[in-house]
Amino acid sequence: MSEPLDLNQLAQKIKQWGLELGFQQVGITDTDLSESEPKLQAWLDKQYHGEMDWMARHGMLRARPHELLPGTLRVISVRMNYLPANAAFASTLKNPKLGYVSRYALGRDYHKLLRNRLKKLGEMIQQHCVSLNFRPFVDSAPILERPLAEKAGLGWTGKHSLILNREAGSFFFLGELLVDIPLPVDQPVEEGCGKCVACMTICPTGAIVEPYTVDARRCISYLTIELEGAIPEELRPLMGNRIYGCDDCQLICPWNRYSQLTTEEDFSPRKPLHAPELIELFAWSEEKFLKVTEGSAIRRIGHLRWLRNIAVALGNAPWDETILTALESRKGEHPLLDEHIAWAIAQQIERRNACIVEVQLPKKQRLVRVIEKGLPRDA
C-alpha cells in the first residue's frame, strides 16, 4: 500500500490518474439527487420512457446512488470523447443511398472499455485508501448519470437533455465510480444555452417536447435502438436514412464547434458501418451481421431490427428499381420485417408514379448546411 494522502490531495491525484487512464475530465460530487426525483417521476408519469419498462421498474432508485452501493458518499464522474476523425456527418446524411449510424456506435462498444478504466481508477485509489469500497457504472445500472455529471462540474444539461461542455461540446461518454470516502466535491458550471433552441427546432420528429424534456417515443435513437416492435408509420418518413441512432440535436448545437476528436483507437469507425450503402446492408445475413458487429453496441438490437431500420431508410430513398428488388428479396422472413418492407415498397412505388427524383426534408437540408459551415472538419 502507498502512503496515505489527505482527502484534498487524494482528490487531485484521482483527477490526475483519470487523465492518465484516458478520461478527458474527472469531477467529484455527493450522492444527493433529490432535486432530480420529481423531474424523473413526472417524465415517467407522462410515459415518455416508451417501452423501456426497466426505467419505470427501477423508479427512484436511479436518483439514489447510495442505495446501489450502501455506504456510498461520493460519485466520481468522468467523460471520454468518442468523436472519430472523418466523421462524415453531412456527406452521409445528404446521400439517401447511404445508412447513417450514430457516431458513438461506429467503433467498439464503449461500456466495457470505460468500465475497465473506471475499475483501474478504483484500484489506484485503493492503493492509498485500503478500506475503500468502490463500484464502476457505465450505463450498466439504474443511475442518473447526467445530473451527477452536472453536479460534478463536467458540464451543464442542454435543452436536448445531454451534457454540454464549453471546451468539448457533447460528443463524449459518461461513467461513474461510486466510492465510500468523503472526498471534497466540485462545483457545477454555469449553463451556456441561454435562449438558444436550435436542438428543439431541428429534431426531425419533434421529440424534444419542451426544454430539457425528450419524449423517447418520438426520438429516432429510441425508435431504431430501444423499440422492439413496429416503428409508428407517421414517424418513418421523418427518419430519413438514419438506421441506428441520431445525432441531429448535437450537430446543430453551436457548442459542438468545440468538439474534440477521440484519442481511443477502439472508437475508430469500422469500415462496413461508416457511410455504408443501404442496399448492401440490407443483403447481410444474420451471420454477416453478427460478425461485423462483434464487440459493437449495434449487435444488441439484433439482425431483425437492423433490417427493419434499413427497410425504413430504403423506403425514404428516391425511387430506384434496385431498391424495389432488394426489398422484395427479403419478403417472408418475419412478420415485423414484412410490414416495414410493404410500407417501403409502397413509398417507392408512390415516388415512381409521381416521378419524384428527390425527397425534400427541409430540416435535414438546413442541418447539412449548418454542419458544412460550422463543422467543416467533420462534415
From Swiss-Prot:
Question: What EC identifiers does the entry list?
Answer: 1.17.99.6
Its catalytic activity? epoxyqueuosine(34) in tRNA + AH2 = queuosine(34) in tRNA + A + H2O
Active-site residues from the entry: 139
- Which range is the signal sequence, renumbered to this chain? none
Q: Where does [4Fe-4S] cluster 2 bind?
A: 203, 219, 246, 249
Q: Output the GO biological process annotations, alphabetical, semicolon-separated.
A: queuosine biosynthetic process; tRNA modification
Boundaries of every 4Fe-4S ferredoxin-type domain copy: 181-213
What this chain does, per the record? Catalyzes the conversion of epoxyqueuosine (oQ) to queuosine (Q), which is a hypermodified base found in the wobble positions of tRNA(Asp), tRNA(Asn), tRNA(His) and tRNA(Tyr).
Its recorded name reads Epoxyqueuosine reductase
Supply the source organism for this entry: Escherichia coli (strain K12)
